[in-house]
């Protein structure tokens, strides 16, 4: 059981890193903040399509990561 959870955790970590790297950047960094990128801050645009799917998948994979970590720590006791 412990080995199965560790394998699931490794798969989840790889998937989480992949999904985060597939997402587009949402800001221009520090240069956008200095040169007046406030319209991006206050004029929030809705996410659609692939961006929305990747955002939700990131949240699900992150929650799964924490659940698996709690399971591993519980079984390790």
From Swiss-Prot:
Record GO terms (molecular function):
protein-transporting ATPase activity
Q: Which GO terms describe its biological process?
A: intracellular protein transmembrane transport; protein secretion; protein transport by the Sec complex
What is the annotated localization of this protein?
Answer: Cell membrane
Q: Which UniProt keywords apply?
A: Cell membrane, Membrane, Protein transport, Translocation, Transmembrane, Transmembrane helix, Transport
InterPro entries per record: SecG
Pfam families for the chain: SecG
Its placement in the membrane is given as: Multi-pass membrane protein
Q: Which residues cross the membrane?
A: 2-22, 57-77
The UniProt entry lists the main location of this chain as: membrane
Q: Which GO terms describe its cellular component?
A: plasma membrane
Record carries keyword Cell inner membrane: no
Please describe what this protein does.
Involved in protein export. Participates in an early event of protein translocation.
Q: Which NCBIfam families match?
A: secG
What family does the database annotate?
A: Belongs to the SecG family.
Specify the protein name: Probable protein-export membrane protein SecG
- Source species of the chain: Staphylococcus epidermidis (strain ATCC 35984 / DSM 28319 / BCRC 17069 / CCUG 31568 / BM 3577 / RP62A)
């Amino acid at each position: 059981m412990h080995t199965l959870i560790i394998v699931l955790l490794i798969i989840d970590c790889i998937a989480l890193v992949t999904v985060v790297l597939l997402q587009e950047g949402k800001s221009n960094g520090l240069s956008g903040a200095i040169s007046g990128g406030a319209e991006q801050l206050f004029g929030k645009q809705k996410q659609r399509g692939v961006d929305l799917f990747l955002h939700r998948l990131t949240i699900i994979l992150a929650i799964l990561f924490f659940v698996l970590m709690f399971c591993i720590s519980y079984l390790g006791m």
